[in-house]
Amino acid sequence: MDTIKAEEISQIISKQIRDYEKKLDVSETGTVLSVGDGIARIYGVENAMAMELLEFPGGIMGMVLNLEADNVGVAVLGDVTHIKEGDIVKRTGKIAQIPVGEALLGRVIDATGEPIDGKGPLGATEFSRIEMIAPGVIKRQPVNEPMYTGLKAIDAMTPIGRGQRELIIGDRQIGKTAIGIDAIIRQKDTGVKCIYVAIGQKKSTVSQIVENLRKHDAMSYTCVVAGCASDPATLQYIAAYAGCSIGEYFRDRGQDALIIYDDLSKQAVAYRQISLLLRRPPGREAYPGDIFYNHSRLLERSARVSADLGGGSLTALPIIETQAGDVSAYIPTNVISITDGQVYLEPSLFFSGIRPAINVGLSVSRVGGAAQVKAMKQVAGTLKLDLAQYRELASFAQFGSDLDKATQAQLDRGVRLVEILKQPQFQPMSLAEEVIVLFAGTRGFLDKYEVEKIKEYEPQVLAYMKSKHQDIMQEIDDKKVISPELEQKIKEALTAFDSVFVAG
């Protein structure tokens, strides 16, 4: 049996003493003065920063929103029932941030960046603050590249460019989200990364949207950020900023990204709730005074950055829900004034079967015209005017039956144009498909058919063009302009199709 030598013991002890490193964990702490309704008042964290994360017992995090003389107002980002008066709160020294990068594509996360799709950790290595300063004037370049939505009515009459902010506004349940989802599906194989931000929605609704995106192979280039109705108001409020930071990651690397905020009305309500609980003075409709700044600083982060910075873009499609079509309410007017145009959806059109239910007269794209390709301008240049004149004539025509031939022809053409602008959900179209259908409508190829036939005409003419005239479709997609020779080819192809369609 080995004997233990005294020298060895002394050597071991002296080595341990030598290697001993005293670790002191110094952190600034505070005490919970009061807590309730998702808001905690903390005394003692004198050096806390705005938007800084504080740690409550049990690992619950809170975000500093109010900095007052003797305490700070903190919005709790978790279950407030586990926090009680007198609890010790630690400063983290970190401003609220979120994981970003390619690893988030195909995933569903909450507003703090935690995965909620049951697929394990994200594996993201980079982080970004949720609040970033928007690019300055010099760092931007004009919007001049198209961002196709795949919807004929939008791409023809209110075109959207990369880096634009186009508002989708309308009452509840009339297809606002459907436009956003179709726009995401249309980005397949274009290299555009998509972010869908669900704010204040039911979890079942978010689940359904994710399933629809998966069904159409759109999740591979999409990240869903969910601040659901059951989440604390703070998470619903910061979800939009978190989603924007993910989009900025791609924008700042020279890529193109598209973000859908669904919807900013619920975000405003969540922010109003937080502000009132923090005892901030209420303004119009009880919203706080900085609600405009809340939306403007979010939407200004969507931009097309200059070529020196990579030339990337972040396009935003914010959604606003109106009450009984009132676009002159506080939040709708705010967001209309911030964005570069709006697509206005009307219940009366929706219920009469015109879907997407876009009101052409009230919808506008302030900067997208410069991004619209020449081929689309050639076929849809007068479409908006034609439809506006048709609506005006239609309202007069109901008072009298004796109309001259020209007026009757204009009315007939208008009915057919309205018909070809209808489009089913989850069926976004390519540029060539849109151009062919609109060419047929605006050049009078549909005038000879009954209105009921138009619905059958569109899928059949597209199938015919793809099988017999793929070269024409390819040329439209590649050159994005209709030359006189190509126009002649399209006319001949559509004339040839007429005999097939009539016979069929």
UniProtKB/Swiss-Prot annotation:
It catalyses: ATP + H2O + 4 H(+)(in) = ADP + phosphate + 5 H(+)(out). The record marks S363 as: Required for activity. It comes from the Bacteria. Coiled coil: none annotated. Its EC number is 7.1.2.2. One of its GO terms (molecular function) is ATP binding. Its main location: membrane. The keyword Iron-sulfur does not apply. ATP binds at G170, D171, R172, Q173, I174, G175, K176, T177. The keyword Membrane applies. It is a peripheral membrane protein. One of its GO terms (cellular component) is plasma membrane. It is found in: Cell inner membrane. Keywords: ATP synthesis, ATP-binding, Cell inner membrane, Cell membrane, CF(1), Hydrogen ion transport, Ion transport, Membrane, Nucleotide-binding, Translocase, Transport. Belongs to the ATPase alpha/beta chains family. F-type ATPases have 2 components, CF(1) - the catalytic core - and CF(0) - the membrane proton channel. CF(1) has five subunits: alpha(3), beta(3), gamma(1), delta(1), epsilon(1). CF(0) has three main subunits: a(1), b(2) and c(9-12). The alpha and beta chains form an alternating ring which encloses part of the gamma chain. CF(1) is attached to CF(0) by a central stalk formed by the gamma and epsilon chains, while a peripheral stalk is formed by the delta and b chains. Produces ATP from ADP in the presence of a proton gradient across the membrane. The alpha chain is a regulatory subunit. This is ATP synthase subunit alpha 1. It comes from Syntrophus aciditrophicus (strain SB).
